[in-house]
């Protein structure tokens, strides 16, 4: 029924101006003309978008909320880090970052960062 429809990721922010600055200057997204009051809409690849709306509080999630697919994660992580994005570092039995990236056999490579509201964002390159 919805298999061929466009999809958007939706995040919440307590400060839309701060979020706009972060996603434009650090992540490199462009604000869409579809942006409406109390919302930010960023155009992403293949007709997808990221919507961020303003709210007084943000419920913190302990999982990835948005995942950007990458053809070259090493390059993308390097550029994001140069733009001031701070990556999460892991050293557990199941996850170990090397140069900000976790390699998962049979799956791919991932790197995670948090936006100013603590939303967890991933960059992912499949195997």
Regions found by a protein language model. Name each.
Residues 2, 68, 78-127:
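Vicinal oxygen chelate
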Residues 15, 72, 115-117:
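Acidic active-site catalytic centers that drive phospho-/nucleotidyl reactions
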Residues 4-5, 34, 61, 105-106:
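A generic fold-level signal
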Residues 18, 73-77:
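Short, conserved charged micro-motifs
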Residues 1-20, 64-66, 124-127:
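N-terminal beta-strand motif that seeds the catalytic metal site of vicinal oxygen chelate
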Residues 17-30:
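Amphipathic alpha-helical segments
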Residues 30-64, 68-70, 88-89, 120-125:
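Conserved short beta-strand elements that form part of the metal-binding/catalytic scaffold
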Residues 10, 38-39, 110:
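A short, glycine- and basic residue-enriched loop/turn
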């Amino acid at each position: 029924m919805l298999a061929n429809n466009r999809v958007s990721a939706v995040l919440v922010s307590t400060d839309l101006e701060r979020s706009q600055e972060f996603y434009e200057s650090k992540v490199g997204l462009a604000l869409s003309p579809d942006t409406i009051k109390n919302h930010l809409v960023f155009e992403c690849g293949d007709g997808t978008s990221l919507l961020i709306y303003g709210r007084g509080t943000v419920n913190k999630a302990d999982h990835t909320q948005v995942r950007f697919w990458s053809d070259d994660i090493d390059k993308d992580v390097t550029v994001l880090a140069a733009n001031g994005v701070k990556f999460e570092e892991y050293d557990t039995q199941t996850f170990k970052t090397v140069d900000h990236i976790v390699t998962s056999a049979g799956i791919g490579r991932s790197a995670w960062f948090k936006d100013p509201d603590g939303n967890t964002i991933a960059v992912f390159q499949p195997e």
